[in-house]
Amino acid sequence: PINLIKSKFDDLSSSSMRQEILKYKDMTIINDCYNASPTSMKSSIDVLSLYSNEKVCILGDMAELGIKSEFYHSEISEYANYKIDKLIAIGKYRQAYCEKFSDKRNCFCFETIEDFEKNVRDILKGTETILIKASRSSRFEKVINILKDKF
């Protein structure tokens, strides 16, 4: 019975863009760009922190947070301290994300995905484990395509 249960778990797959693990060459991508809230951001960072190689968060805006949006975005950067190696923030709240991240040398802010694309090879090596997380409205599947194209 235990082998049957294990085999059923092995057959499970995550929903597209929800904690979806993608292997691409020497890179592992955690595609979690379907939705984002403060709680789900923290949970995803916790998953990323379990990996042994260099850990990178590419984070976009969390939508529909109201007047506390800046606070929640900066809270995520504080939470990520000592759990990840690099933080890449893209979107309206990019500065708030980097506000409390302690390693400023490894915190990168971009207004648009296109700006990130122009700089990606200067920041990443293509061997990292990368969490990609944002609200659906940010269309972060484009980031995955950029990573596949550049590496």
Which residue ranges define each predicted feature?
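ATP-dependent carboxylate-amine ligase
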Residues: 1-151
